[in-house]
Amino acid sequence: MSLSNSLGLLGRKVGMMRLFTDDGDAVPVTVVDVSNNRVTQIKSQETDGYVALQVTFGSRKASRVTKPQAGHLAKAGVEAGEIIREFRVTADTAGQHKAGAVIAASSVFSVGQKVDVQGTSIGKGYAGTIKRHNMSSQRASHGNSRSHNVPGSIGMAQDPGRVFPGKRMTGHLGDVTKTTQNLDVFRIDEARQLLLIKGAIPGSKGGFVTVRPAIKAKPQAAEGAK
């Protein structure tokens, strides 16, 4: 799937559960609410230099929206949302949508399709190198004093005489944008506009996520091919 034709949906992580296949196998799935994705703007090559669909999700009080954004949304005739994102698409895909229209889950995804899910990972505060970078602790005894769970020496010799940027050290863990790739769409609840995605996705319950067709999905082999 090319990035130039990857229309996706915005959603909210509801939580995890498990479903059963016809064979009785338990499958862990993440429930994502993708209801009421509204098109706020259709960007074209002539006016914007690229083709994209601007989509909003959720709802926000009118008093919490800036005047420029309120005017932008009023032009499209849509209710203010909590987040706005753009999806680069082809001109044909953009021509199939209109500003103010609602995008249904089944019109973008299908059962068994590979998707990439992007979200903000759970923030865990200030963490040490063992938890943050999976480093090993030092010896518990035999000459080690008060240096059990520390990274050890981080410096260099007199030359270069400094700590290189990017050195793995203690610091804030989590609360960063993460993408989980090549997950399967296990089921689509069209009545409630829910995506049931096999496996775990980044973020905590209630967090916003972006679901796109997988860009590294391997092509499906034709039936009967060896």
Swiss-Prot record:
Keywords: Methylation, Ribonucleoprotein, Ribosomal protein, RNA-binding, rRNA-binding. Residues 135-158 are annotated as: Disordered. Methylated by PrmB. One of its GO terms (molecular function) is structural constituent of ribosome. It holds the Pfam family Ribosomal_L3. Coiled coil: none annotated. The keyword Ribosomal protein applies. One of the primary rRNA binding proteins, it binds directly near the 3'-end of the 23S rRNA, where it nucleates assembly of the 50S subunit. Part of the 50S ribosomal subunit. Forms a cluster with proteins L14 and L19. Belongs to the universal ribosomal protein uL3 family. This is Large ribosomal subunit protein uL3. It comes from Variovorax paradoxus (strain S110). The lineage of its organism: Bacteria, Pseudomonadati, Pseudomonadota, Betaproteobacteria, Burkholderiales.
